[in-house]
Design a protein with these regions (language model features):
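Aromatic-lined carbohydrate-binding/catalytic grooves of carbohydrate-active enzymes
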Residues: 1-139, 147-155, 161-173
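Active-site-proximal substrate-binding groove within the catalytic cores of carbohydrate-active enzymes
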Residues: 10-14, 18, 99, 107-153, ...
Length: 354
């Protein structure tokens, strides 16, 4: 954590840095395999020097304190031995001033000549990389991963799909928002051309043609503490349009005795999160809820996975609130499969179609 970061804690310096060796994640994967989990995709954050959300786009080599390239490769190889898939977090918008190649000439510039930025995330001071430059860095960095024996199944290009298109007024690389979406799309398309599954933070309609899956697509209340009142009745509008086009993983937390996110995963026919280990506390839905053992979470995920396997390529054709307060909801897929969730009683019913 850089001292200028909004998350830096000068009063508790021991909280500012955390290293989880690749070997620890490898052992965790072995434990998951021993529980009989057949399909796993591991999304790995903070795998490179000098840590999560730092010095992008110059994000290599693999973190030495975590085991370096050798430790990372061992983790990847173990994943593949079990038939699992491995992907990384990466970033080509947040442009950190500490990056060795940082050059403000490649940062997004406003018409008045100023360069917007902030110091909120772990890497401290940053601008925004003009997306005209992003494809170059993607190809450069992924070539380095390949050279070191890291066989990627997927890659997550952070924030590309949860932020609006950027504009740049630098006369050397003028960019409209439409241009920005095109360059971001080019990055995803290049990943796909290399056999790497593409993903980003959430899904915007412009990005659907480029993405295989996303990080998540939570309702807004899921990004706030569980005691925060909902602003309305959450319904899966996005899935009613795009369910058969992109995979959406859903949080599976039982956040309180009255709220279980598993029900939303079922209602939307999404994929489940088995383990989530968020970097920033109380941010992006990373709140402490009721503790669920890995064994119980595995069984919960089995139910959601079974439904997702049967409906992933099907349209979500109907959703309805069966009670006036929305506490009981039903969704139906194009083959007749239906899900009824009672959020008051915390129960569900699944009926499989043809």
């Amino acid at each position: 954590m850089q001292p200028e970061s909004g998350f830096f804690d000068p009063q508790n310096p021991e909280k500012n840095n955390r290293v989880v060796p690749f070997s620890v994640r490898e052992q965790q994967i072995r434990e998951i395999h021993d529980l009989g989990v057949e399909k796993v995709y591991l999304h790995l954050d903070g795998w490179a020097e000098p840590g999560y959300d730092n010095q992008h786009p110059d994000y290599t080599p693999a973190c030495q304190a975590a085991g370096g390239w050798g430790g990372m490769k061992s983790l990847v190889d173990t994943m593949h031995d079990f038939g699992y898939k491995f992907g990384i977090h990466d970033q080509y918008r947040d442009y950190y001033h500490a990056a060795p190649s940082y050059d403000e000439n490649y940062a997004c510039r406003l018409p008045d000549g100023t360069i917007p930025g902030h110091s909120y995330w772990a890497g401290g001071p940053q601008s925004y990389l003009c997306a005209t430059q992003a494809p170059f860095y993607v190809k450069r960095n992924f070539a380095e991963l390949k050279k070191n024996g890291i066989r990627l199944d997927g890659a997550y290009l952070d924030v590309f799909t949860c932020n609006e298109g950027d504009e740049c007024a630098n006369p050397e690389h003028v960019m409209t928002r439409r241009d920005c979406y095109m360059y971001r799309g080019n990055c995803f398309s290049w990943l796909l051309s290399q056999g790497i599954l593409s993903s980003s933070e959430e899904v915007s309609d412009w990005a659907v043609p480029y993405l295989v899956f996303c990080h998540y697509a939570p309702y807004d209340f899921m990004l706030r503490p569980s005691e925060t009142p909902k602003k309305g009745i959450p319904v899966p509008l996005f899935n009613l349009v795009y369910h058969d086009c992109v995979i959406e993983p859903w949080m599976m937390d039982r956040v309180s005795k009255d709220e279980d996110y598993m029900l939303y995963a079922l209602l939307a026919g999404g994929a489940p999160y088995l383990v989530r280990d968020g970097v920033y506390p109380n941010t992006d839905g990373a709140f402490d809820g009721e503790k669920i053992s890995l064994e119980e979470m595995t069984e919960r995920c089995r139910v959601v996975t079974e439904l997702h396997e049967k409906t992933a390529l099907l349209e979500l054709v109907r959703h309805e609130c069966m009670t006036a307060d929305g506490s009981v909801q039903k969704s139906e897929f194009s083959d007749g499969t239906y899900v009824i969730c009672d959020f008051a009683e915390q129960i569900y019913e699944i009926g499989y179609g043809a």
